[in-house]
């Protein structure tokens, strides 16, 4: 049985972890969301979220976006390559409803899977 937990090992926790991704990222972008990824040596994917107050003003909207990104990652972690991912959002993401945002995230993570298979 596949575990769908979201323990600390699956999260980017320190600035050092985030900087590792920002140095040489692979990008997958849409007008509202960008997912940066970089191969890691851990054998499992990890995720970090950066949602600036400048781009999404209201806290409940930022929390909704983070919740949806974490949930998509949690449910699909076993299909993702062993990479560190950072999810960045732009203005306009708050106008997307939950279904649209989930579709955008899915499309971007599938693109990262294809990029990882090529390299």
From Swiss-Prot:
It catalyses: Endonucleolytic cleavage of RNA, removing 5'-extranucleotides from tRNA precursor. InterPro entries: Ribosomal_Su5_D2-typ_SF, Ribsml_uS5_D2-typ_fold_subgr, RNase_P, RNase_P_CS. SUPFAM superfamilies: Ribosomal protein S5 domain 2-like. GO terms for cellular component: ribonuclease P complex. It is an enzyme of class 3 (hydrolase). One of its GO terms (molecular function) is tRNA binding. Its EC number is 3.1.26.5. Keywords: Endonuclease, Hydrolase, Nuclease, RNA-binding, tRNA processing. One of its GO terms (biological process) is tRNA 5'-leader removal. Consists of a catalytic RNA component (M1 or rnpB) and a protein subunit. RNaseP catalyzes the removal of the 5'-leader sequence from pre-tRNA to produce the mature 5'-terminus. It can also cleave other RNA substrates such as 4.5S RNA. The protein component plays an auxiliary but essential role in vivo by binding to the 5'-leader sequence and broadening the substrate specificity of the ribozyme. Belongs to the RnpA family. This is Ribonuclease P protein component.
């Amino acid at each position: 049985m596949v575990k769908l937990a979201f323990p600390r090992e699956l999260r980017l926790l320190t600035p050092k972890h985030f900087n590792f991704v920002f140095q040489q990222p692979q990008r997958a972008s849409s007008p509202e969301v960008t997912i940066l990824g970089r191969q890691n040596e851990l054998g499992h994917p990890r995720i970090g979220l950066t949602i600036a107050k400048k781009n999404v003003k209201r806290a409940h909207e930022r929390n909704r976006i983070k919740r949806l990104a974490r949930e998509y990652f949690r449910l699909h972690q076993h299909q993702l390559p062993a990479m560190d991912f950072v999810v960045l959002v732009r203005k306009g993401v708050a106008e997307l409803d939950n279904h649209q945002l989930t579709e955008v995230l899915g499309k971007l993570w599938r693109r990262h899977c294809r990029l990882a298979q090529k390299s």
